[in-house]
C-alpha cells in the first residue's frame, strides 16, 4: 500500500464528494489533513453546495482514521482566505507537502445565453481558484524543499461538452496551468500533475439539469442519469465512477511512487476519451 506517513495535505473542496474521498484516502495512507471548503451557496450554481456540517463530517471521518486534521471554511475565489488557510496549516503542522486543488462547480447553459456572473463564477472557482491555491502553497513548499500538487481537471479538459462551455473552458485552462506550474516549479523539487475524472457519482451531477442532459431532454430522472452514465465508459459494468477510484489516482500522483512524474494529465474515466466520436443530436435539414 502507498505510504505517505508524515505528509501534510491541503485539500480544497473537501467537505463532500471527491474532496472528502481524497481526504480519507490520503489520511488512510498516513497523511495529516487540512480540509477546506466554501460551505455556502454560490448563486449561479443550480444545486446545493456543501455545508459546514458536511465539512465537520469530513473532519470527523479523518479523525476516525487516527490522523490529525483541521477543517477550515475557505472560498478559493478569495486569495486572502487561502493565504490564511496556509498560515493555519503551517501553524498547526509546520509544513504543507501536498496540495489537492479539487474545489469545483458545474452548471449548464448555452454559451451565448450565459450571464456574466455565470461565466465569471465558473472561471473564478474552477480555474482562478486553482491558480490561487497554487500561489498560496508554493512559498511553503519551496521552504520545505519540495512538494506535490495535484489539480482536478476533467475529461472536459480534453474535449468539448455541449451546454457547459464555461466549465470546459475552465478545465482546459487547468491543464495549461498544470503544465506551466510543472515547468516553473520543477527546479524547486515541486511536482504538479492533474487528474481528469470522467463521470463520477457526486452531488455535482445529481440534480434535475443533469438528469435532463442524460435523458436527452426535459423530464429526465435519476434513473436516466444512472443508465446514461454507462455510455461514458468502454469498460463492462461501469456506470458513474466512485470518487474512491479518482482518489487512488490522486494518492499515487501525490506520493513518492510518482516521484519522477510531473506535467502529466491523467484520465481516470473508464476509457471515456477513447470512445468513437458521434453526433448524438444531428440536424438533418436547415
Which positions does each model-derived feature cover?
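Active-site helix of classical SDR
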Residues: 134, 170, 178
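C-terminal helical subdomain
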Residues: 194, 216-261, 266-270
Amino acid at each position: 500500500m502507498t505510504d505517505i506517513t508524515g505528509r501534510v495535505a491541503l485539500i480544497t473542496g473537501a467537505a463532500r464528494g471527491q474532496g472528502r474521498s481524497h481526504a480519507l484516502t490520503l489520511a488512510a495512507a498516513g497523511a495529516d489533513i487540512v480540509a477546506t471548503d466554501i460551505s455556502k451557496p454560490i448563486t449561479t450554481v443550480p444545486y446545493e453546495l456543501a455545508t459546514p456540517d458536511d465539512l465537520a463530517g469530513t473532519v470527523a471521518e479523518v479523525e476516525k482514521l487516527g490522523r490529525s486534521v483541521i477543517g477550515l471554511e475557505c472560498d478559493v475565489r478569495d486569495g486572502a482566505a487561502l493565504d490564511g488557510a496556509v498560515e493555519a496549516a503551517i501553524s498547526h503542522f509546520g509544513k504543507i507537502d501536498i496540495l489537492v486543488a479539487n474545489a469545483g462547480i458545474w452548471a449548464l447553459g448555452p454559451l451565448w445565453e450565459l450571464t456574466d456572473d455565470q461565466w465569471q463564477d465558473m472561471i473564478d472557482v474552477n480555474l482562478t481558484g486553482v491558480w490561487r491555491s497554487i500561489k498560496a502553497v508554493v512559498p511553503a513548499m519551496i521552504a520545505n524543499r519540495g512538494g506535490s500538487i495535484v489539480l482536478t481537471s476533467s475529461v472536459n479538459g480534453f474535449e468539448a461538452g455541449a451546454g457547459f462551455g464555461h466549465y470546459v473552458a475552465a478545465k482546459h485552462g487547468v491543464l495549461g496551468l498544470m503544465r506551466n506550474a510543472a515547468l516553473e516549479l520543477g527546479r524547486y523539487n515541486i511536482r504538479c500533475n492533474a487528474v481528469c475524472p470522467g463521470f463520477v457519482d457526486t452531488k455535482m451531477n445529481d440534480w434535475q439539469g443533469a438528469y435532463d442532459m442524460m435523458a436527452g431532454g426535459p423530464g429526465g430522472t435519476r434513473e436516466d442519469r444512472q443508465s446514461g452514465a454507462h455510455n461514458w465508459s468502454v469498460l463492462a459494468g461501469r456506470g458513474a465512477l466512485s470518487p474512491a477510484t479518482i482518489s487512488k489516482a490522486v494518492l499515487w500522483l501525490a506520493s513518492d511512487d510518482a516521484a519522477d512524474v510531473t506535467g502529466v494529465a491523467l484520465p481516470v474515466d473508464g476509457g471515456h476519451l477513447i470512445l468513437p466520436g458521434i453526433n448524438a443530436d444531428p440536424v438533418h435539414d436547415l
